[in-house]
Curated annotation (Swiss-Prot):
Gene this chain is encoded by: accA
TM region(s), chain numbering: none
GO biological process: fatty acid biosynthetic process; malonyl-CoA biosynthetic process
Subunit structure comment from the entry: Acetyl-CoA carboxylase is a heterohexamer composed of biotin carboxyl carrier protein (AccB), biotin carboxylase (AccC) and two subunits each of ACCase subunit alpha (AccA) and ACCase subunit beta (AccD).
Any one GO CC term of the record: acetyl-CoA carboxylase complex
Record bears the keyword ATP-binding: yes
Key word NAD present: no
Function: Component of the acetyl coenzyme A carboxylase (ACC) complex. First, biotin carboxylase catalyzes the carboxylation of biotin on its carrier protein (BCCP) and then the CO(2) group is transferred by the carboxyltransferase to acetyl-CoA to form malonyl-CoA.
The protein, known as: Acetyl-coenzyme A carboxylase carboxyl transferase subunit alpha
GO MF term list: acetyl-CoA carboxylase activity; ATP binding; carboxyl- or carbamoyltransferase activity
Pathway(s) it belongs to: Lipid metabolism; malonyl-CoA biosynthesis; malonyl-CoA from acetyl-CoA: step 1/1
Lineage, broadest ranks: Bacteria, Pseudomonadati, Campylobacterota, Epsilonproteobacteria, Campylobacterales
Length: 311
């Protein structure tokens, strides 16, 4: 069953009308309603504000890392465990082929349904998850495989156990190691990019965001609670924080914005997967033309340029 946001009510009404027309076997009505749906979808999604894009980034029907992996990674084989503590299901690692190119895919996975969300810890990795990501990244480096990182997390897990096992060290270690990997790396925010939890798999040669994704140092609710002592002012905070893909592209904090189908990734998962796979293949072709020394040097220069400003 599809989920609808407040600003999608008009779309829901037409979807319901189409379903009823199909039950009645009225194909003529279905044809007319589908045309109306196309117009309404274009109208609704044409001028989304920042808060609406945040809602889409968190949409329960939005494709997660495994959805994309199943869509475009051929001959996929999952790799488990950090070889030190346990396997963290909030981080998924696969090797396979994207557009005929062998690659490693490392992603954050939120999970669907109560049991799966609990198993995946709502997409909040423990330190062993980030260490698993590092182990697999080093494996990719050993076999000269490019890496695609799929970022989608509300943040790294802040629990006592995670802190005791070195959450901050695990994140910091990944930042250092990923900056120096001797293979092409591409990171894409596919939903939520929550602070250090996102950065831990976000250091790459190319950092992109899906059109309706967000990337921030704190959630808008958390920001509103701190600044105004009122979490309900999240819409105001969302606008002020500049967390959308277009905002971050304008601030030169990301390299590219990957377009989504006109009706959003949550309504056209296959279309979104094609856009993401196409982006990876096209950028990889350019990165593979660089020598390893050039690749790492450009990556380091890019990292050091973050935060620079002009008076």
């Amino acid at each position: 069953m599809s989920s609808y946001l407040d600003f999608e009510k008009s779309i829901k009404q037409i979807d319901d009308d189409i379903a009823n027309a199909r039950i009645k076997g009225d194909e003529h009505a279905v044809e007319i309603l589908n045309k109306n749906l196309e117009k309404e979808v274009a109208k609704v999604y044409k001028n989304l504000n920042e808060y609406q894009r945040l809602q889409l980034a968190r949409h329960p029907d939005r494709p997660y890392a495994i959805d994309y992996i199943r869509s475009f990674l051929m001959d996929a084989y999952e790799i488990h465990g950090d070889r030190a503590f346990r396997d963290d299901p909030a981080i998924v690692c696969y090797v396979g082929y994207i557009g005929g190119k062998k690659a490693m895919v490392i992603g954050e996975q939120k999970g669907r349904g109560t049991k799966n969300k609990l198993r995946r810890n709502f997409g909040m990795p423990h330190p062993e998850g980030y260490r698993k990501a590092l182990r697999v990244a080093k494996l990719a480096e050993k076999f000269n495989l490019p890496i695609l990182f799929l970022i989608d997390t509300p943040g790294a897990y802040p629990g006592v156990g995670a802190e005791e096992r070195g959450q901050s060290e695990a994140i910091a270690r990944n930042l250092f190691e990923f900056a120096n990997l001797k293979v092409p790396t591409i990171a894409v925010v596919i939903g939520e990019g929550g602070s250090g939890g996102a950065l831990a798999i976000g250091v790459a040669d190319k950092l992109a965001m899906m059109k309706n994704s967000v990337f921030s140092v704190i959630s808008p609710e958390g920001c509103a609670a701190i600044l105004w002592n009122d979490p309900s002012k999240q819409e105001q905070a969302t606008k002020a924080m500049k967390i959308t893909a277009d905002d971050l592209k304008n601030l030169k904090l990301i390299d590219d914005v990957i377009k989504e189908p006109i009706n959003g990734a949550h309504r056209d998962k296959d279309g979104a997967a094609k856009e993401l796979a196409s982006y990876f293949v096209s950028k990889l072709e350019k990165l593979e033309k660089l020598s390893i020394d050039e690749l790492v040097a450009k990556r380091i220069d890019k990292i050091l340029s973050v935060g620079a400003y002009e008076e």
